[in-house]
Amino acid sequence: MNYLPVSLNIDNRHVLVVGGGKAALEKLQLLSQFRCFVTVVGEELSDETLQYSSFSHIRPFQLEDLEGVFIVYACSSDRELNRLIKQEANARGILVNTPDDPELCDFLSPAFFSDGPMTVAVSSGGTDVRKAIAWRNRIKTYLSNDEGLIP
């Protein structure tokens, strides 16, 4: 895979998260840091999952869920459903991320931290998420130490 590092402007955009498990919750928590409209769709959604979404539908994914969506996080435990979501979303010009399945990803969500307008992001291209998180943490610690770069 060959990923171009970019930052997407999701301000006031619609983001769809399909699934109600741990991966979906992690993406919802990530998205809560941004000003976007989040719809979560899944047959089983926990109260915690619901608190991070603007809109929710406790039901199976439907193709109509893709209408007006900017990006999709396909977090279902059903790989075939994730594959269908990717195929249908891509046909509509929508980018898809499928956690733990880089083959189905159009984009990756790097490990990052922000300090005001500055953001540092680290990605392993989907090959070693734990290492990317460790690098992010080490960089943040380094910048927070004697250099005084991060208060």
Where are these regions (language model features)?
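Hydrophobic, well-ordered beta-alpha structural blocks that scaffold small-molecule cofactor pockets
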Residues: 1-44, 48-52, 56-59
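Adenosine-phosphate binding glycine-rich loop
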Residues: 9, 113-151
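Residue-level detector of alpha-helix initiation sites
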Residues: 21-23, 79-80, 126
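Short amphipathic alpha-helix with an adjacent loop that forms part of the alpha/beta core around
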Residues: 60-68
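ADP-ribose/adenylate-binding Rossmann-like module
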Residues: 71-75, 82-107
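Glycine-rich, charge-decorated loop segments at or immediately adjacent to ligand/cofactor-binding or catalytic sites
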Residues: 105-115
